[in-house]
Design a protein with these regions (language model features):
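Short S/T/G/P-rich N-terminal loop/turn motif that feeds into the first structured element of a domain
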Residues: 1-202
């Protein structure tokens, strides 16, 4: 992933260029799978994050198609400055993606845990995944660890929602049902206690 900071006054040109490139190249199975998200909140609000999705890191050995890259450099590259590049690895054992779950809104939480807190941090994530599965939580949650380009033990947890209305709905009854299942599986008030342990690891 890479953060893109759009230059002042260039937002319309940038977004138009990204849309054209996406329409022209992202529908091909042979092209690299790029996704561009606008950041809506936080310190990087109004910037963008550009992600190249790969099934395996081996795909980095294959360069992006020269024609596709040239087109991106023509229609989008003049309008932004680049931030640091990072490689993230999805942890399937900690992620929960129910069949048919999707959404155009992502809530992404970044964590940087201390070395001493690794066990508490990942035990909580394992338990959340199990509670989601057993409670029938209907939205996706993906957990990614930083494999390269980060200073520290960085993890991002990505929640998918069907817009803000979907986010509000997901954090209502489905979230409460997941927490109840968590406490049923691991003991009274286990969710709150384990959450506090995670907070202490950060």
């Amino acid at each position: 992933s890479r953060t893109l900071e759009v230059k002042d006054g260039q937002m319309d040109k940038f977004m138009s260029g990204v849309a054209k490139k996406t329409q022209m190249y992202n529908n091909s199975e042979d092209s690299a799978n790029f996704v561009t998200f606008q950041i809506l909140t936080g310190p990087n609000a109004t910037d963008f994050i550009r992600v190249r999705w790969m099934e395996s890191i081996d795909e980095l050995d294959n360069p992006v198609d020269a024609e596709e890259l040239s087109y991106w450099n023509k229609v989008a590259r003049p309008y932004y400055t680049e931030g640091a590049a990072r490689i993230w690895s999805r942890n399937a054992n900690l992620s929960h993606v129910p069949e048919g779950s999707d959404g155009n809104l992502r809530r992404v939480i970044y964590y940087n845990y201390k070395d001493s807190g690794e066990q508490d941090f990942f035990r909580f994530r394992q338990r959340v995944k199990k509670a989601m599965v057993e409670s029938g939580y209907g939205s996706a949650m993906n957990v990614l660890g930083c494999a390269s380009g980060c200073n520290g033990n960085w993890v991002q947890v990505r929640f998918s929602h069907d817009g803000y209305e979907g986010q509000s709905a997901d954090y209502g009854e489905p979230l409460q049902a997941m927490i109840e299942k968590y406490n049923e599986l691991y003991g009274n008030d286990a969710y709150e206690q384990d959450s506090d342990k995670v907070d202490a690891t950060l």
